[in-house]
Amino acid sequence: MKIKSDYSNEPQWKEVTVKSTLPKELACLDELAHNMWWAWNYEARNMFKALDEELYEEVGHNPVQLLERLSYDRKEAIVKDKKLMKQVSDVYKKFRAYMDVKPNAKRASVAYFCMEFGLNQALKIYSGGLGILAGDYLKEASDSNVNFCAVGFLYRFGYFTQSLSMDGQQIAKYDSQNFNSLPIERELDENGNQVVVDVPYRNYMVHALVWRVNVGRIKLYLLDTDNDMNSEYDRPITHSLYGGDWENRLKQEILLGIGGMLTLKKLGIKKDIYHCNEGHAALCNLQRLCDYIDGGLTFNQAMELVRASSLYTVHTPVPAGHDYFDEELFGKYMGDYPAKLGISWDEFIGMGRTNPDDHSERFCMSTFACNTCQEINGVSKLHGWVSQKMFAPLWKGYFPEENAVGYVTNGVHLPTWTATEWRKVYDKYFDKSFMSDQSNESIWHAIYNVPDAEIWETRMALKQKLIKYIRDKFTKQWLRNQGDPAKVVSILERINPNALMIGFCRRFATYKRAHLLFTDLERLEKIVNNPERPVLFFFSGKAHPADGAGQGLIKRIFEISRMPQFLGKIIFLEDYDMQLARRLVSGVDIWMNTPTRPLEASGTSGEKAEMNGVVNLSVLDGWWVEGYREGAGWALPEKRTYQNQGYQDQLDAATIYGLLENDITPLYFNKDAKKGYSEDWVKVVKNSIATIAPHYTMKRQLDDYYDKFYESQAKRSHKLEANDNKLAKEIALWKESVAERWDSIYVVSKDEDALQDIATGHKIKVTYTIDEQGLNDAVGLELVFLKNAPVDDVNIHKVIPFKMVKTEGNHYTFEATFDATVAGAYKYAVRMYPKNDLLPHRQDFAYVKWIG
């Protein structure tokens, strides 16, 4: 027998974790490292940095990894260093004092669902604005000490890291995260085993491990499908943020909504309010419906309870930005749910359609959210109005401005985004109640007491800090990826701290109009190369790997930045993350934003700049519509001049050039020869901090959600649940009765002839008698007047409610009086609607019949 040259079976690898141990004197460091409180407390970050500054930079400011890699000798040296040990002790005492305060039990409790959370660059479970906002929200919930928890995903690869090739092509790289080296912990059951949640996907289960992030006092639960219990088709569900095809996207949204609710249920967590931050999480309400129905309620009764305690926040300004799923794909995973709900398939999928009977229409998560959440809000005042129009087809009997779509303008977490240098200024000059009373503009007005020289010195220190950061971070990377060492060195050397520095940093979607500045290169060249008034532009941001147009913009900016006349004057900084963002929003002089109106739902990067004395130059869109104050920044008009976008771009570009040439640079460089700074510029900075910043903190945003939505919804929800859900059952029964008889309600008689020709100053009485078919005063009537205008420009002139004046059996007589005060041409009609004081608003039961 011939002997084989090799013979081996496959090894059965088993995981083993070797943990770095800390001396008992440093045991508190592990607790500190595993609570993201350090992410917004500079004393804690400085303490970790002091343990080993070089290693701290090497591990990307990740305290968990820092402690893992500290050498035995270094740990021993730390214990012997009295000054450093005192620093450790002081930080831990501050942390414990913060953590040991009991939650505010008087405020409504909230469960918050989101696809991404931006807490710190060390935990890559975010991509952009939505995630950063959600992360800031959790931090403020912790600071405000409310009863709050959140659900999201632990992504194996997170969002991509970005580099640029020698010709400016974006290179996306997905780096695997080592979960054991992250500031997270396994959520354990009573037996010490990691909690696993079994999530039903039609005909099989997906098994998600549950991890926990301690965000100060708040718990964020993260689901992870990348484990051996799942097939090769389901492990990737939590691989990448917004990764894969539409089938994987649906699987992600099932996991977030249904899996998220099952997680809370398994952990014994019940909250007053369930907040869907974007439509991705809408299926949490499907699971809640199932739970109530399993408890003995009908579908309609369950819907009353689910809607009352649910809030949907939309961040998308256009219908195309929402998620839509083909019926076949949706049925592949969701086909079992109609039976669980006790309704038909058409009724179920119709909950995600604007027109439920249109079988060609795809299922939309945002529509499902609107149909299962009592309250809906946009993320700025303008976006609230945009959302009213966007969702208007869901409530066809009402005009957009009548819809119960509210708004809460986004804010930013002050401790996270305010540079240490500014924190020290605020601590020195502002009232001691500042952090707990951030929306109090009178406190911020103390900025006027800060000497001008101190304001200027703070700004210059942060500009120098940004320049140092760029030189430290990008020198090696640019030499490695972008060739031509002489050109790289020239760029870095030409960064002039005395130049007016302008930042344009955000996601590179085409509607952000990053190209606008480059409309007239000759004019731009004169602006940046003015020897008396030099200007420098920093660009940064990622384009989605599937967005060729966005990547093309990056490539174009890179190419321009390498032209001799723009070398060191136009600079693109790759891999925009939270760390780079913090340096930029505090280090530049002006934050520029040029979105296509009205496609900026809110935008928050400009708000972060405000906290650091950085002045905004922006189109009046998103938050800046509300935030702009004359003498505290610059604005491009809100109204479009041209419908042709190309013409509008040219006009906006010319406006920006003009502002830079005639207003901004003369102001900045009007420096006093003796003082060395521009008093006029410092005045703008002070105005900006005093009059704008107080209104855009995350503290104000959280308080707005409580004041506008959480508290009132919780109060109503508790009423519906009381006495074995008595009120919920009554409302469901009433709606069923109205729905059953609605089509048979008819007009018995009417008198509206006097409305044909009216002279101003006259009062006209209109009378209708309605047969309510035994509904017992369940109908309301109103006279709706519109201004005569094109069909696509409908404006309500007046809505006049009818009063019920007489009843005879099922016949109800209503009267309304029209007071003709303003001459003009109008259209009118009479609208009939179900009337019940127990409803939160009309769109909760949007039956409408136009009669007459």
Task: Give residue ranges: language-model regions.
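Catalytic cores of carbohydrate-active enzymes across secretory and cytosolic contexts
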Residues: M1-G852
